Amino acid sequence: MTKLVNEMILVLDFGSQYNQLITRRIREFGVYSELHPHTLTAEEIKEMNPKGIILSGGPNSVYDEGSFRCDEKIFELDIPVLGICYGMQLMTHYLGGKVEAASQREYGKANIQIQGTPDLFKDLPEEQVVWMSHGDLVVEVPEGFTVDATSHHCPNSAMSKADKNWYGVQFHPEVRHSEYGNDLLKNFVFGVCDCEGKWSMENFIEIEMQKIRETVGDKQVLCALSGGVDSSVVAALIHKAIGDQLTCIFVDHGLLRKGEAEGVMKTFSEGFNMNVIKVDAKDRFLNKLKGVSDPEQKRKIIGNEFIYVFDDEADKLKGIDYLAQGTLYTDIIESGTATAQTIKSHHNVGGLPEDMQFELIEPLNTLFKDEVRALGTELGLPDDIVWRQPFPGPGLGIRVLGEVTEEKLEIVRESDAILREEVANHGLERDIWQYFTVLPDIRSVGVMGDARTYDYTIGIRAVTSIDGMTSDWARIPWDVLEVISTRIVNEVKHINRVVYDITSKPPATIEWE
């Protein structure tokens, strides 16, 4: 934490998949927030000087052996504390109340009734719908606490000890299903913690530029530039901070979209006057991927090769100490932490070799995708970069399901170009968060002309989202889908069938691999 942040809400991570949403909601209020491991000591927290502490939810019972705990001394810091779900139970356990397994687990929407006029529920309706997700519950609040809300299955749905600024809720206010959840969090952040709400992307730029300068000093930085939103914003931010100390390397690994390699060089080398070195490594990557079909193995191979390519280039350049990456908050969350399950490894996180020669700089690793776009705009990047489609580091390597071959890459490349062209032609670019084609390792029978065919199927994936943590399938008009399907079947060799993915996230991820 740098001194440029004069107010911050600290969220301690106990393993809930909702944790990042707490941080996100608070930032939406214009207050800076960070998610940190539950293992932080009270002394470390004191040095960070947060305006408030939130104990997140989690999958454990407070009585489980090895369950996640925090330093009890945080309750001696004279800092407001809000416990959410497991966080409320842990607070109760530490402060002398009683937690038990519920006779009936409660998952989903529930109606709560507010009692009195507690601070967290100021100016909110006496009855409201909230999102519950718990197996244990508080059966006896700690001494000096009042019960602020009840529900049919959870008599102690919320509690507080106002003179200490300690609060607990058994439900999840950060989830949209809690209809007044944002208002409750605002009451804690502004009413209890007395935050002002002056944090913005402009502040973030100043904070990160100071961090970069302090970290790098007079040393050199190598940036992994792909031309996507994340790496472009990283390059612009670091270039703004340290200028010519930054060298960008653009690796053409043969897994890019149609026309992408040429576009990247033109935009950054010519348009932004950055030092960009292009490396043609297609054969190197494809040879490594030969015979590999497991998606996790492909991701790690691609991640490793990226680092080794940078190693080779750094040896040529001499004196490179740092590697900059466009790792986002969602990358870290989905790759798992000590308290969260791994969903999939990200090339910016799980694929890094242990013997890499660089120290990492990841200035976006506390931001969500929409915040990165806002940052790009603040940095003066053009709209065609800021609103460019999200594109995974492994590229088309994970949009070809199974083994990657040049023939399959060309199929995905051409079909994806048609999809992007028609989405643009029909003015849908800003309505759809991400859209692309995938090539499952599936062949099916078809008829083209008078001949029987046995060719590949192309899948179209298009989703709406805000930050990529959750998404819904995009309702592209049927007539537009018909145009796209017809063009793909007629213009892309070895395709005789097109399908549309109508699965949300969860249960599916946005990418198929």
From Swiss-Prot:
PROSITE patterns found in the cross-reference section: GATASE_TYPE_1 (PS51273), GMPS_ATP_PPASE (PS51553)
Position of the signal peptide: none
One of the Pfam families matching this protein, by short name: GMP_synt_C
Active site (record annotation): C85 (nucleophile), H172, E174
Glutamine amidotransferase type-1 domain sequence ranges: 8-198
Entry EC no(s): 6.3.5.2
Domain of life: Bacteria
CC annotations in GO: cytosol
InterPro entries given in the database record: Class_I_gatase-like (IPR029062), GATASE (IPR017926), GMP_synth_C (IPR001674), GMP_synth_GATase (IPR004739), GMP_synthase (IPR022955), GMPS_ATP_PPase_dom (IPR025777), NAD/GMP_synthase (IPR022310), Rossmann-like_a/b/a_fold (IPR014729)
Record: residues binding ATP: S226, G227, G228, V229, D230, S231, S232
GO MF term (any one): ATP binding
Top EC class of this enzyme: ligase
Reactions catalysed: XMP + L-glutamine + ATP + H2O = GMP + L-glutamate + AMP + diphosphate + 2 H(+)
Database matches in CDD domains: GATase1_GMP_Synthase, GMP_synthase_C
Keyword Zinc on entry: no
Pathway membership, UniProt: Purine metabolism; GMP biosynthesis; GMP from XMP (L-Gln route): step 1/1
Keyword Oxidoreductase: no
Record keywords, A-Z: ATP-binding, Glutamine amidotransferase, GMP biosynthesis, Ligase, Nucleotide-binding, Purine biosynthesis
Protein role: Catalyzes the synthesis of GMP from XMP.
Description of how the protein assembles with itself and partners: Homodimer.
Protein name: GMP synthase [glutamine-hydrolyzing]
Species the sequence originates in: Bacillus velezensis (strain DSM 23117 / BGSC 10A6 / LMG 26770 / FZB42)
Name of the gene: guaA
